[in-house]
Amino acid sequence: MVNVLKGVLIECDPAMKQFLLYLDESNALGKKFIIQDIDDTHVFVIAELVNVLQERVGELMDQNAFSLTQK
């Protein structure tokens, strides 16, 4: 039997990949989204969740960034 899934290959640094693996393991998006963990910098994910992933990554980047006016 053959299973077909539409996916997207994501290339990222190892730190971001760990964040994606964390989101997948904790079911933060409501379901598992990683189809295949390929290597240290590549992950194959379900295509329909790419926009949600981009939002989560954006939130993470906003939390880790600071402006020059902050002390």
Swiss-Prot record:
Keyword annotations: Cytoplasm, Disease variant, DNA damage, DNA repair, Ichthyosis, Nucleus, Phosphoprotein, Transcription, Transcription regulation
GO biological process, one term: nucleotide-excision repair, preincision complex assembly
Pfam families: Tfb5
Principal subcellular localisation of the protein: nucleus
Its job: Component of the general transcription and DNA repair factor IIH (TFIIH) core complex, which is involved in general and transcription-coupled nucleotide excision repair (NER) of damaged DNA and, when complexed to CAK, in RNA transcription by RNA polymerase II. In NER, TFIIH acts by opening DNA around the lesion to allow the excision of the damaged oligonucleotide and its replacement by a new DNA fragment. In transcription, TFIIH has an essential role in transcription initiation.
Subunit structure of this chain's protein: Component of the 7-subunit TFIIH core complex composed of XPB/ERCC3, XPD/ERCC2, GTF2H1, GTF2H2, GTF2H3, GTF2H4 and GTF2H5, which is active in NER. The core complex associates with the 3-subunit CDK-activating kinase (CAK) module composed of CCNH/cyclin H, CDK7 and MNAT1 to form the 10-subunit holoenzyme (holo-TFIIH) active in transcription.
Disease tied to this protein: Trichothiodystrophy 3, photosensitive: A form of trichothiodystrophy, an autosomal recessive disease characterized by sulfur-deficient brittle hair and multisystem variable abnormalities. The spectrum of clinical features varies from mild disease with only hair involvement to severe disease with cutaneous, neurologic and profound developmental defects. Ichthyosis, intellectual and developmental disabilities, decreased fertility, abnormal characteristics at birth, ocular abnormalities, short stature, and infections are common manifestations.
Designated name of the protein: General transcription factor IIH subunit 5
Organism: Homo sapiens (Human)
Taxonomic classification: Eukaryota, Metazoa, Chordata, Craniata, Vertebrata
Chain's gene name: GTF2H5
